[in-house]
Amino acid sequence: MCGRFNLIDSPEIQWLCESLGIQLYSEQCKPDIAPGGSIAFIHCKGGERLVSEATWWLFLDQDPDSSNYLKPNYKYASFNSRSDKLSNKRAIAYTPYRESRCLIPASAFVEGLGDKKTYHKIELEESAITFGGLYKEHLNRDTGEIIYSASIITLPPL
């Protein structure tokens, strides 16, 4: 499981972006990204690789207090999508796995041990990583704007 991650503007991240033929802007880099936060993700649209911003939570609901705002659906913890459930037709990530895969760049990530207090931060030395991910497009009915949400594909817990 990935509980938090970092995306810092470094030579390694710049090299990764150049290798993928994309441009990552400094405002898309963040030192401590938590579930529900804004993340950069790489996806294809019309045969072109793009970097877009997404909420790190795959399933969003309309906020009843605001007609224009989508927020994480906390009923379903969907910031991560377990790899062993992607083939299950009843799984919430089943359709995005078949239709909208993406890459999520990172410089470091944090793993929890399940007790919510003990964490391990894995910092990549002179390297960068991309997580495999899933994304969804949501239409803001008032503005016509496309809003993205995404999750990281993870292994089942040990």
Where do the protein language model's features map onto the residues?
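Short linear sequence motif anchored by a di-proline
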Residues: 1-158
